[in-house]
């Protein structure tokens, strides 16, 4: 019977520990749930998903928040984003920002690449610096070309909102080159390693 008071005392001491919130999984573990589409390090292995390695954390967080509240069109990201807290999204954003983008070689048309480089320099470079490499305006360089086609179609079909300046610049590129503008930009970005 003397053991009973000791067990009761130990049980009382353990109560505060049980009431503490459990620490969530680390950001790296959360980020690995993205691997099926975006690659284990954020460099996508498949042509319909964007690479998110090296992405500016604010761009990542803004995109996830937009998915979370259905402001950004997607097949499944809206449902996925709703499963994460703001803190978890921030942790994943920091994880992916530290990763190095590893573009995959793609088949491109050299004539379109050259035209796309000119269009980018004239209309896009100011916001998408260094040829569209990872930065605070998102990553274009080295993205899969089919993904870029889907993203451009979303903008053109008004499934995704254009920033005003981007819409004006894009209209100017289309006025200049017509139907060749979009494929040229896509080939240029897809050509970059």
Which residues make up each language-model segment?
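Gly/Gly-Pro-rich "capping" loops immediately C-terminal to redox-active cysteine motifs
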Residues: 42-73, 78-82, 117, 132-157
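Positively charged n-region of N-terminal signal peptides that target proteins for export
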Residues: 1-5
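C-terminal capping alpha-helices of c-type cytochrome domains
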Residues: 82-104, 146, 151, 171-193
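Accessory recognition modules or surfaces
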Residues: 80-83, 87-112, 125-143
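Bacterial N-terminal signal peptides
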Residues: 8-18
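Conserved hydrophobic/aromatic "anchor" residues
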Residues: 67, 95-96, 120, 155, ...
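Sequence/structural segment immediately N-terminal to covalent heme-attachment motifs in c-type
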Residues: 23-41, 108-130, 144, 180
């Amino acid at each position: 019977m003397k053991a009973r008071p000791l067990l009761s005392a130990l049980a009382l001491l353990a109560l505060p520990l049980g009431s503490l919130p459990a620490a969530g999984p680390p950001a790296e573990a959360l980020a690995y749930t993205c691997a099926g589409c975006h690659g284990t390090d954020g460099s996508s292995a498949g042509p319909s998903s964007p690479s998110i390695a090296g992405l500016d954390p604010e761009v990542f967080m803004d995109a996830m928040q937009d998915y979370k509240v259905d402001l950004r069109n997607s097949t499944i990201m809206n449902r996925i984003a709703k499963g994460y807290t703001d803190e978890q999204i921030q942790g994943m954003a920091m994880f992916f920002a530290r990763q190095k983008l590893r573009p995959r070689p793609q088949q491109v048309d050299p004539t379109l690449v050259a035209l796309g480089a000119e269009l980018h320099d004239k209309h896009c470079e100011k916001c998408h610096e260094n040829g569209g490499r990872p930065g605070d305006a998102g990553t274009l360089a080295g993205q899969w070309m089919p993904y870029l086609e889907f993203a451009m179609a979303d903008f053109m079909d008004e499934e995704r909102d254009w920033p005003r300046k981007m819409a004006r610049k894009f209209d100017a590129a289309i006025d200049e080159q017509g139907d060749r503008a979009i494929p040229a930009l896509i080939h240029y970005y897809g050509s970059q390693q």
